[in-house]
From Swiss-Prot:
It comes from the Bacteria. FMN binds at residues 128-130, 291, 306-310, 332. HAMAP family: Chorismate_synth (MF_00300). It comes from Thermus thermophilus (strain ATCC BAA-163 / DSM 7039 / HB27). The lineage of its organism: Bacteria, Thermotogati, Deinococcota, Deinococci, Thermales. This is Chorismate synthase. The gene is aroC.
């Protein structure tokens, strides 16, 4: 399974083409739209989320509520485009255009992208570099999550800590309903209240906040990924996908950075066997991956999200046309997007996992894949 996305932050729409989905996957807009809604929620979001009401539209590859085996094409309209139609007009015109951006914003792709492509209007960089692009990748991830759900896999994204506040209530699958109702997707109401207070303070001071996001999956078969070649190692693929999320600057599988400061005897998960459970582990400090492959335990992917780079009290910069000092431009932005980023991390991790299932089990139809996965589960149980 592979996919491409296209579209700008203030263009008419976002697009995706997904190739390699099996025929017969039950799929409707309502399998995708709830995930788009989750991405738009979260305390600390900006005015853009008031304007947009993201809804996916199928353009190809789905008929009668099922995939046909052909490429699936998705579209999400940008409601804000009506306010930017002249600025984003693809027709030839004289430069500079309205709302041209020449003062590179620190922490953004503006300057490096301008240098790379020779743009003097840095809007040609920021429009594609914007996190708005993740709306379509979440839609693709929702398709992957639908496929995984039919293979017995469940996923969730949440926030273990943000704004300098850590949740003291550990994650449990029983807390998923609480997470889904939480404005910060946190497990701990007290920590959440303090984080909200800090978000309000940062907003009043024209500042931004980051945090830690985590995606968890259960029900995975062991053996997804590979130890044979470096580029098939699942932890490497998950890390690459996580680091492709705008503002993510670090990733770990399980408590990796904590593990790094301990002895091996304190870190590695002992293996047990019983007739009822087969092979199992009492701990999961490996985060569900060993040797680049799933172990069958819960998969835990954690990422660090830096504070959003667009500040209401902008940092000093330089105009790329005049080379004169300037303050960075103020583009509409969030105070924090950590809760939304946890949804994005879950959706994007699901894409990698769906790809791993399709690579391992193959099959042109959903029924074929389900049969092959079940036979594999039986073989693993008998091992």
């Amino acid at each position: 399974m592979r996919f491409l996305t296209a579209g700008e932050s203030h263009g008419p729409e976002l697009l995706a083409i997904i190739e390699g989905l099996p025929a017969g996957l039950p799929l409707s807009e309502e399998d995708i739209n709830p995930w788009l809604e989750k991405r738009q929620k979260g305390y600390g979001r900006g005015r853009r989320m008031v304007i947009e009401r993201d809804r996916v539209e199928f353009r190809a590859g789905v008929r009668g509520g099922r995939t046909t085996g052909a490429p699936v094409a998705l579209a999400i309209k940008n409601a804000d485009f009506k306010n930017w139609a002249e600025i984003m007009d693809p027709a030839p015109g004289n430069w500079p255009r309205k709302r041209a951006l020449t003062a590179a914003r620190p922490g953004h792709a503006d300057l490096a992208g301008g240098m790379k492509y020779g743009h003097k209007d840095l809007r040609d960089v920021l429009e594609r570099a914007s996190a708005r692009e993740t709306a379509m990748r979440v839609a693709v991830g929702a398709v992957a999550l639908k496929l995984l759900s039919l293979l017995g896999v469940e996923g969730v994204g949440y926030v273990p800590g943000m704004a300098g506040v850590w949740a003291k209530v550990p994650f449990s699958w029983d807390l998923v309903p609480r997470i889904e109702e939480s404005p910060l997707r946190m497990t701990d109401p007290e920590a959440e209240a303090e984080a909200i207070r800090r978000i309000d303070q940062a907003k009043a001071e024209g500042d931004t906040l980051g945090g830690i996001i985590e995606a968890r999956f259960r029900g995975l078969v062991p053996g997804l990924g590979s130890h044979v070649h470096w580029d098939r190692k699942l932890d490497g693929r998950l890390a690459q996908m996580a680091l492709s999320i705008p503002a993510v600057k670090g990733v770990e599988i399980g408590p990796a950075f904590e593990n790094a400061m301990k002895r091996g005897s304190e870190v590695h998960d002992a293996i047990y066997w019983s007739p009822e459970r087969g092979f199992y582990r009492e701990t999961n400090r490996a985060g569900g991956l060993e040797g680049g492959m799933t172990t069958g335990e819960e998969l835990v992917v954690r990422a660090a999200l830096k504070p959003i780079a667009t500040l209401m009290k902008p940092l000093p910069t330089v105009d790329v046309v005049t080379h004169e000092p300037k303050d960075a431009a103020r583009e509409r932005s969030d105070t924090t997007a950590v809760p939304a980023a946890s949804v994005i991390l879950c959706a994007l991790s699901a894409i990698v996992l769906a790809q791993a299932y399709l690579e391992k089990f193959g099959g042109d139809t959903m029924e074929e894949i389900q049969e092959r996965v079940e036979r594999y589960r039986e073989r693993v149980r008998a091992y």
